Amino acid sequence: MSSMRTHYCGLVTEQLSGQEVALTGWVQRRRDHGGVIFIDLRDREGLVQVVCDPDRPEMFKAAEEIRNEYCIRITGKVRPRPAGTENTNLTSGKIEVLCYELTVLNPSVTPPFQLDDDNLSETTRLTHRVLDLRRPQMQYNLRLRYKVAMEVRKYLDAQGFIDIETPMLGKSTPEGARDYLVPSRVNPGHFFALPQSPQIFKQMLMVSGFDRYYQITKCFRDEDLRADRQPEFTQIDCETSFLTEQEIRDLFEDMMRTVFKNAIDVDLDAKFPVMEFREAMARFGSDKPDLRVKLEFTELTDVMKDVDFKVFSGPANSDNGRVVGLRVPGGGAISRGEIDAYTQFVGIYGAKGLAWVKVNEVAKGRDGLQSPIVKNLHDAAITEILKRTGAQDGDIIFFGADKAKVVNDAIGALRLKIGHSEFGKASGLFEDVWKPLWVVDFPMFEYDEEDARWVAMHHPFTSPKDEHMQYLETDPGKCIAKAYDMVLNGWEMGGGSVRIYRSDIQSKVFRALKINDEEARAKFGYLLDALQYGAPPHGGLAFGLDRIVTMMAGADSIRDVIAFPKTQRAQDLLTQAPSAVDEKQLRELHIRLRATEPKTTV
């Protein structure tokens, strides 16, 4: 391999017995057993046991002085371990290396934690990320990330895609998430924006005749962070010309099947199911449903319109209200304390409470139900609730009644919480498999009540369905987009659409978004001009590499599959970024800081 080492530690096996090897790595652990020193030597491939006998005094003295995380080099002979001392958990577990020479390449100060400590706080891990990355799970995660990226590249290369870089310094288009702005020193008062996606550039590449483009690139969004979000993230960005929506979906579905098979030996469905956005929201309250959870909403809005219970009848008679039931088979066993905990949980999503009915005996109707709300429901409503939900003896039905968004968010989250709970798994309400699907036919626009205007649900370059073009100027709320998301186990793995490729249609969409022609020309004139030069029909899709690897690795957060991530406050604890800069740098950029106004309290 090199003059310093002949093999990786974790790859030394019984096939090398009797051979002399040179190994380098870090001391995982050192044990002194009555005059014989054992060293667990670690590198990226794993561990090997090194034995140091005192009959080599100089080597043995060096072994006595080493400590955890010292970087060392050893030479020695591979030999079988004594019978009964084998370690079946290690690739090298049947052998050990009898050390001849030991050189300390670099000592280490005492680490702030043991690498095998599984109870570290994320703050500690991110502050000492260099050490955290030495841990076997983190080594595995980042190597898996590399493998996934390589499989993507191999697949797309075989399909004729060309890897083309697009600019990192671009024009700010304040639609959607906030841009990260970069001041221009040579153009005072002007700013670049870091890309939220290469969207417009890849469309212009289609106009330029590069009919199959991709890149694996960084994107940036200045938004509030969650477990699956980072201010900078990596996108597998793809665009094609002259393919239909179905052909685009088929192509990238096959890519994802291939990547999962080659990267982690998982066979995804031979054909992903397809679900309309409207159906996903009706059944699961989410446009990225986790199909592993075998619980669904039951629509009860119409049933509750005339009940003498304002908690239900109010939303049922409201234009933007919704009432649903969530039947949990066997849920009658859920305790009152657990119900109270669920009530508190849905409050996180804006729900004002959580009504419930335990079904003790269906045949008895009202008399077979246990709940404080039963007295507020008339017999016809009770009969219809039991019928629609398919309630059985021993079930519980939870209810959500509020604005549709609150109901979808709160009861949707409750569905997942129950399904993923120990009760849910023991009751067969959760299936531990890979469940991909396509969600299609998204609304083109959604109404922003605060700004009193329509906004693009995905982005303003998505094409409406051909038969819905007529609604752009008359009734934007009716427009359905040629948009599609690939969802896996409740995570959006990627999303895309067929794009608008005619300048006149793009202008109509801008007008529907209350972007007048003058503003559209100022912000997107270069795109509108490009579309006039015989732009081809085109569409594409972008996958979140971080999310894909997180799913494959079974990690809790995308921060576990990124080498140097930011916290949920968008800070890098290792380098202490972001940081203050000196006055000279600010003057060169023609920037003056304004003092933060103190918050006033009433």
Swiss-Prot record:
It comes from the Bacteria. Its EC number is 6.1.1.23. It is an enzyme of class 6 (ligase). It holds the Pfam family GAD. Residues 199-202 are annotated as: Aspartate. L-aspartate binds at E175, R221, H458, R499. The record marks H33, G84 as: Important for tRNA non-discrimination. One of its GO terms (molecular function) is aspartate-tRNA(Asn) ligase activity. InterPro entries: Aa-tRNA-synt_II, aa-tRNA-synth_II, aa-tRNA-synth_II/BPL/LPL, Asp-tRNA-ligase_1, Asp-tRNA-ligase_1_N, Asp/Asn-tRNA-synth_IIb, AspRS_core, GAD-like_sf. ATP binds at R221, D222, E223, Q230, E492, G544, L545, D546, R547. Keywords: Aminoacyl-tRNA synthetase, ATP-binding, Cytoplasm, Ligase, Nucleotide-binding, Protein biosynthesis. GO terms for cellular component: cytoplasm. GO terms for biological process: aspartyl-tRNA aminoacylation. It is found in: Cytoplasm. It catalyses: tRNA(Asx) + L-aspartate + ATP = L-aspartyl-tRNA(Asx) + AMP + diphosphate. Belongs to the class-II aminoacyl-tRNA synthetase family. Type 1 subfamily. Aspartyl-tRNA synthetase with relaxed tRNA specificity since it is able to aspartylate not only its cognate tRNA(Asp) but also tRNA(Asn). Reaction proceeds in two steps: L-aspartate is first activated by ATP to form Asp-AMP and then transferred to the acceptor end of tRNA(Asp/Asn). Homodimer. This is Aspartate--tRNA(Asp/Asn) ligase. The gene is aspS.
